[in-house]
Every structure is written in structure tokens, then in C-alpha cells.
């Protein structure tokens, strides 16, 4: 069993989570999420631009145990939010927040099941996370790193107001080949 969270981190989480939108609930993962989580992360079209190729239930369970022990907004940690459809309780995907620079910056990432892509759920979830980070937690800068071939994520980030800051050429050896990535960023002063 994971050790209890420090009081300050537990209180911070209680004040901020879950996040709700008109259609979504963004919350900590639960054990009942793991079969759906493992299933969509194991799909080739989902894993294509991610660091994994296969995502087993064993890996999903290890992920869950690691996430249970994390405090919300713990510096230098990736905190994953489950994205639940309020209407039916289905797990649509997840949004990751990499808290950096003692709460001044964060890197964002997202993974969604193909069944819930192209319906505005990722945009809605990202807007909720951006509002949390900029408006409630007063972050200065948000970033996202994306494979240059991931046109869906690029379109989403640009639609949310992120601007491309860098093109890293062959900066990552990824699934047997050198790959390019874009760095996107958004400052609080640019946030709408």
C-alpha cells in the first residue's frame, strides 16, 4: 500500500481536483479504469507517437500504483488525470501534467482512445487543465513536445493558442529510427 500523501499536497489536491467541464470529469485514476486504460494505450494507432509499443495490464497496474503515491503538483513529477465522460462514465483518455520549476512551468501531454477522438473531448480536457494551471496555480509557462508527424496533436495545440518555439531535428531515437519533434509553448500572458 502506498504511503499517505503529505498533508500540504493532499489539501492542495482536494482544493483543485476533480476538474469538471460540461461533458467531462478529470480526476485521479481508479482501479476500475485500468482495463480501458491498458486497452486504448495498447492500440497501434494510439501507441504510434508514444514511447511504448505495447501496454499490458501489468504496466497499467504499475502505473496506477506509482500515480497513487504522487501528490498533486509535486515538482518534477508527471501527474496523470483520467478523463471520464460524465454521461456514461467511460474513460476517454488521459492528460499528463509534468510539474516543473517549482510550480512555475508545466509540460502537458495527452492520450485519447480512438473511440473518443475528433469529438472535442481532448480540447475540452486541455482547456480545463490550462485554466487550472494558469488561473488557479499561477503557472508562467506551459509546454508540449510533439512528434512532427502527429498532425492531430499539432492542430489541437495550435487551436489552443500554443505557438511552435522549436523544431528538434532527429533529436530522439524512437522505435528504430531518428525522429523530429516540435516544442510548443504558451505563456500565461498569451492565454485567453
Question: Residue ranges of each PLM-predicted region?
Answer:
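Short loop/turn motifs at secondary-structure junctions and domain boundaries
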Residues: 71-76, 162
Amino acid at each position: 500500500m502506498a504511503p499517505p500523501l503529505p498533508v500540504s499536497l493532499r489539501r492542495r489536491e482536494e482544493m483543485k481536483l476533480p476538474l469538471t467541464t460540461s461533458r467531462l470529469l478529470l480526476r485521479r485514476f481508479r482501479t476500475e479504469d485500468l482495463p480501458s486504460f491498458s486497452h486504448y494505450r495498447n492500440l497501434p494507432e494510439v501507441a504510434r507517437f508514444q514511447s511504448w509499443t505495447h501496454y499490458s495490464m501489468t504496466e497499467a497496474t504499475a502505473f496506477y500504483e506509482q500515480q497513487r503515491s504522487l501528490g498533486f503538483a509535486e515538482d518534477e513529477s508527471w501527474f496523470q488525470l483520467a478523463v471520464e465522460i460524465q454521461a456514461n462514465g467511460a474513460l476517454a483518455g488521459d492528460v499528463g501534467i509534468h510539474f516543473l520549476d517549482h510550480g512555475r512551468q508545466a509540460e502537458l501531454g495527452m492520450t485519447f482512445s480512438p473511440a473518443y477522438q475528433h469529438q472535442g473531448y481532448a480540447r475540452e480536457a486541455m482547456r480545463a487543465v490550462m485554466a487550472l494551471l494558469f488561473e488557479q496555480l499561477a503557472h508562467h509557462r506551459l509546454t508540449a513536445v510533439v512528434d512532427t508527424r502527429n498532425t492531430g496533436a499539432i492542430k489541437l495545440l495550435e487551436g489552443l493558442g500554443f505557438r511552435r518555439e522549436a523544431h528538434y531535428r532527429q533529436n530522439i531515437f524512437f522505435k528504430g529510427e531518428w525522429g523530429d519533434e516540435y516544442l510548443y509553448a504558451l505563456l500565461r500572458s498569451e492565454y485567453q
